Amino acid sequence: MSKAINEKLVVWIEEKVKREYAEDISLVLLYGSFINGTANPKSDIDCYFIPRTERGYELAKTFILAGVGYDIFPMDWECAGNIAELEECLIPLVGDVKIIYSFSAEELKRFQRLQAKMKHNLADRQVLQAAARKRAEAAYKLYQDICKPNPLAEIRKLAGHIIMQLADAVSIYNHDYFHRGLKMQFQDLLKLQKEKDIPLRSCEEYLHTIQAKTAEESIRHSYGMLCTVGEYIGVGFSEELARDDGESGETAGMVKDISLSAVCLQRELDDAHREYGSERYDILNFYEWDNL
C-alpha cells in the first residue's frame, strides 16, 4: 500500500512543482529507502528541494498519509556544498539521490559538480582524516554533556548521537559513508568492520549503547566506543572511564532502527518544546531494547 502511495506522491510532487513553482525551484531530489531498496510498508519518501527564490520555500510540506508521516523540506546550495565538503553528516543527500525536477541544465550541472567534488573528497586521505577527526571531536563534546546531571531521556539521546557521530567517523575514515542511512547503519558498520581493519569493539560498544538499560550503561558504552574509535583514527581524549567486555552480534535490525529513530524523534520533540513551548515528551525514558 505504502509503495503505491509513494509512487503517486512522487508524481504529485513533480506536477506541483512544474505547475506552481517552475521558476522558484532549482532541483527536487529523492533519497533514502524509496530509491535504495530498504523501504518497508511504513516507509515514507525522503524528498528535499533546493529553492531558487524565497517563494520556493513555500513548497515545504509536512503531512500524514495512511498513518505515515512525510516531510518535503528545503535545503539551500550552501548546505549542499557543505555536505560535498564532508562537513555535514547527511552525505547520501548529495551522493545517493534521484533528481525528479531541475529548473535548467545549468542547475543540474551545478549539482553534478558538487557530487564530483564529494567523490574527490572521499578519495583524499587528508580531507577524510580531518572530517573523521571533526566527528570524533563532536562526539567527545557530546560525551562531556552526557556526564553532567541529566535525566535518563537526555542521556539516551546524547548517547545515541555520540555513536552516530562515531560511526560516521569510522566510515568516512575508510573512504565511505552509510549509503542506506540510519535504518541499516549497524549492519553496514558490521560489514565495514569485516572488510576493513576496524576494531570489533567499535561495533560491540555501538550495540551495547543501544541495549543499555541504565544511565550508567549508556555513558559507559558510548564512551567505550568513543575511546575505541578515537584510538583507531588517531584522536586522543583526556578522560578515562572503565569499560567492560561484552559480546557482539547482529540482533534484530529493528532494534537499531527504532533506537536511533527514537533518538532523532526525541531531539525534534526537545526542539519543539524549546522553540514553540509545546508540551515536553521524554519518550526515551520508556525505551527498552528488549521490550519493543
Set out the residue ranges of the language-model regions.
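Metal-dependent nucleotidyltransferase catalytic core
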Residues: M1-S43, Y48-V97, M254-F286
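Short amphipathic alpha-helical segments, especially helix-boundary/capping motifs
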Residues: L9, Q115-N121, Y143-D145
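Short, exposed beta-strand "edge-strand" segments with a Pro/Gly-rich flavor and a Y/T-containing core
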Residues: A66-M75, I99-F103, H175-H179, L190-K191
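Intrinsic-disorder-associated interaction segments
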Residues: S2, N6, I100, S104-E107, ...
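Glycine-centered small-residue hotspots that permit tight backbone geometry or close packing
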Residues: A22, E106-K109, K196-D197
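Short hydrophobic/aromatic-rich motifs at helix boundaries and adjacent loops
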Residues: I5, G32, F111-A116, A138-K141, ...
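Conserved nucleotidyltransferase catalytic core and NTase-mimicking acidic/glycine-rich helix/loop elements
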Residues: Q126-L292
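Internal, well-ordered alpha/beta segment that forms a basic, Gly-enriched binding/recognition surface
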Residues: W77-K134, A138
